[in-house]
């Protein structure tokens, strides 16, 4: 039996086992997916511990996505640029790090038939969640990428390696019509479901609204967007997509789209 798992600090609410167990079943993989709750005292020994336990692959969540990078032998290009690893492969005694949030975001937009190349994207929030999204938009030839932050100068220092523009929320109020608005802030996430990062006036200026929050599935941001005729994309398929990509890395397989859809539909019932 192959051993896999999720590494983090507080993991009681994780949906990851359901994603991975479905992939195991549909692809006849004899696998076991565990939750590994790691205390901060042991954060410097994560990769070594995985090797000792015979773990073949692991997902990594907060607060260890950055800390684990120093412990890896090889890190993928996208993970280096993003500055975070959320997937580890142990193979032939070596450890490899990837960022599958990058691929999960891409899968989510592809499924929703949102074209990136030649279009403009405004990204709300300058936290860690924005990095994989900015990198994917850059690599996919978006015409214009604008990061919207409460502190524009701080955001510029933090994201200066990206070929993007910067804007304050006040400046966002004055823009003309654009293509897509992406929320990477925790606004609207349970239990603060009544919060939204931008005004309805701003939302009306876009054609597409994307929210990486998936609890609830339809945030106040997406509800406002839908009511104003925008195409809306919820964040649940990004979660599914990043998990599926991890499985493809670990097991050298190509997961069928029907499996992805079944996982999405099963998880959707939770919210």
From Swiss-Prot:
Catalysed reactions, as listed in the record: shikimate + NADP(+) = 3-dehydroshikimate + NADPH + H(+)
Residues where NADP(+) binds: 125-129, 212, 235
GO cellular component labels: cytosol
Catalytic residue positions: 65 (proton acceptor)
Top EC category: oxidoreductase
Keywords: Amino-acid biosynthesis, Aromatic amino acid biosynthesis, NADP, Oxidoreductase
Database matches in Pfam families: Shikimate_DH (PF01488), Shikimate_dh_N (PF08501)
Gene Ontology terms, MF aspect: NADP binding; shikimate 3-dehydrogenase (NADP+) activity
PANTHER family in the cross-refs: BIFUNCTIONAL 3-DEHYDROQUINATE DEHYDRATASE_SHIKIMATE DEHYDROGENASE, CHLOROPLASTIC (PTHR21089:SF1), SHIKIMATE DEHYDROGENASE (PTHR21089)
Family: Belongs to the shikimate dehydrogenase family.
HAMAP family: Shikimate_DH_AroE
Function, in words: Involved in the biosynthesis of the chorismate, which leads to the biosynthesis of aromatic amino acids. Catalyzes the reversible NADPH linked reduction of 3-dehydroshikimate (DHSA) to yield shikimate (SA).
Subunit structure: Homodimer.
Protein name (Swiss-Prot/TrEMBL): Shikimate dehydrogenase (NADP(+))
Organism field: Clostridium perfringens (strain 13 / Type A)
């Amino acid at each position: 039996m192959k051993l896999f798992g999720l590494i983090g600090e507080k993991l009681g609410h994780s949906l990851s086992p359901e994603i991975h167990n479905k992939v195991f079943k549909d692809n006849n993989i004899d696998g076991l997916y565990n939750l590994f709750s790691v205390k901060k005292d042991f954060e410097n020994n994560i990769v070594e511990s995985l090797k000792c336990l015979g773990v073949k692959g692991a997902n990594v969540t907060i607060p260890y996505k950055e800390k684990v990078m120093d412990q890896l032998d090889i890190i993928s290009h996208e993970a280096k640029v993003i500055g975070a690893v959320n997937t580890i492969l142990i193979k032939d005694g070596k450890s490899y790090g990837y960022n599958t949030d990058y691929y999960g975001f891409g899968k989510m937009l592809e499924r929703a038939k949102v074209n990136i190349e030649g279009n403009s994207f405004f990204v709300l929030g300058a936290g860690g969640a924005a990095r994989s999204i900015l990198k994917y938009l850059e690599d996919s030839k978006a015409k214009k990428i604008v990061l919207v932050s409460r502190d524009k100068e701080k955001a510029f220092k933090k994201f200066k390696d990206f070929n993007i523009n910067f804007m304050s929320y006040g400046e966002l109020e004055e823009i003309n019509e654009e293509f897509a608005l992406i929320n990477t802030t925790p606004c609207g996430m349970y239990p603060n479901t009544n919060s939204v990062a931008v005004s309805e006036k701003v939302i009306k200026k876009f054609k597409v609204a994307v929210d990486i929050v998936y609890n609830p599935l339809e945030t106040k941001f997406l509800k406002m967007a839908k009511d104003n005729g925008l195409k809306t994309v919820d964040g649940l398929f990004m979660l599914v997509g990043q998990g599926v990509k991890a499985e493809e890395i670990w097991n050298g397989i190509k997961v069928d789209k029907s499996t992805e859809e079944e996982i999405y539909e099963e998880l959707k019932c939770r919210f």
